[in-house]
């Protein structure tokens, strides 16, 4: 029998749960890991667009702008922002007439 499973047994015409090893450190650790995994999965599904956009565009460091005129820096920022905005439109809407 696995330490991580609960066994249902008939007790006096009722269904009960017999969990003898619930204080075992391995069971406690597995429960904590399972709960953390569930929380992270839910957060990932709720905020996946923000998270992956941050990883895709936010963590990339652009080239150094040392010695570059401000007008060229602004032009580069606009190009980068347009690239990010273009990525938002990956859904295609089709209108039927």
Swiss-Prot record:
Residues of the site described as Essential for channel activity, possibly by being protonated during channel activation, and by forming the channel gate and the selective filter: 37
Domain of life according to the entry: Viruses
Pfam families for the chain: Flu_M2
Regulation: The M2 protein from most influenza A strains is inhibited by amantadine and rimantadine, resulting in viral uncoating incapacity. Emergence of amantadine-resistant variants is usually rapid.
Membrane spanning stretches: 23-43
Keyword tags: Disulfide bond, Glycoprotein, Host cell membrane, Host membrane, Host-virus interaction, Hydrogen ion transport, Inhibition of host autophagy by virus, Ion channel, Ion transport, Lipoprotein, Membrane, Palmitate, Phosphoprotein, Signal-anchor, Transmembrane, Transmembrane helix, Transport, Viral ion channel, Virion
Complex formation: Homotetramer; composed of two disulfide-linked dimers held together by non-covalent interactions. May interact with matrix protein 1.
Family the UniProt entry places it in: Belongs to the influenza viruses matrix protein M2 family.
Name of the protein in question: Matrix protein 2
């Amino acid at each position: 029998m696995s330490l991580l499973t609960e066994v249902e047994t008939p007790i006096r015409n009722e269904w009960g749960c017999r969990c003898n090893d619930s204080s075992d450190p391995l069971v406690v650790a597995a429960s904590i890991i399972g709960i953390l995994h569930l929380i992270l999965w839910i957060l990932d599904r709720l905020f996946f667009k923000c998270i992956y956009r941050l990883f895709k565009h936010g963590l990339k460091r652009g080239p150094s702008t040392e010695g570059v005129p401000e007008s060229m820096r602004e032009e580069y920022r606009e190009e980068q922002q347009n690239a990010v905005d273009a990525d938002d439109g990956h859904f295609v809407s089709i209108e039927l007439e």
